[in-house]
């Protein structure tokens, strides 16, 4: 009873520039650093858990993890580009302890967004083979700070500015692009 969506990258485009730090998740930290201090940091530079739920990292080359790509423990999936991707559970309901459990992935930008400027934002998702739920309700929340809450693995109170308009995403083979325009407000 696990919905598992694999996330490829957040792409912020302003005049063709990608403002995401490590958008394909391929720059990694040393195995010893990750294995000794992995909460809430992901093994890929610039990415982190944005809640108490633990996102997953899959790579064809990073051997510090037990679930390399393309077989990832939840099914089988090649990365959209490169050799790595991240995955997270949007909803699980498999026991009373994990009722409404959610995972959120956070990422860093290489520069501050300029107030009043419009940015094209896109990312790609695909369902895990083992997923038993599907969703149309997936999006991205942009914030001038890290917007994390490690005290909970439940639904966070943020309204995403970029939302899926493709309907329910059933595909377990092909990556689906989710995109939209974002006008940066004050503070970033």
What role is predicted for each listed range?
Residues 17-118, 122-128, 133-143, 150-188:
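Aromatic (Trp/Tyr/Phe) and Gly/Pro-enriched flexible surface segments
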